[in-house]
């Protein structure tokens, strides 16, 4: 048996969504959605606010396996889809919303800082696009050899 420590890498995903009403319009109800999803027993993901009040973000917890990462994520995503549907909302992800975007930007300290760095116009653009982020963490001590 080798005396070397097991080297692990970690994977994670983030998926951002616009919230839409039954007519396909963006709605600024993220705080309400976060409230009712907080009461659900989501074991594999965290639901977070985004820079706009018509957006939410689903974040996986770090995994060592691609297979478990995605299967666990989609189990909880199914619950999120069910809850938003029951509350007469739809999720729209990956890209920019094609209609009129009435997104209200947040004024938390974190977002005020981003606005100062990016400028008002560029910061507002952040509230007009949603994406998918796939994170890969290199094994610890990768560059120490």
Regions found by a protein language model. Name each.
Residues 1-122, 128, 145:
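Terminal catalytic/cofactor-binding subdomain
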Residues 134:
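An acidic/histidine-cluster motif and surrounding catalytic segment
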Residues 138-145:
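Inter-helical turn/loop segments and adjacent helix faces that build the functional surface
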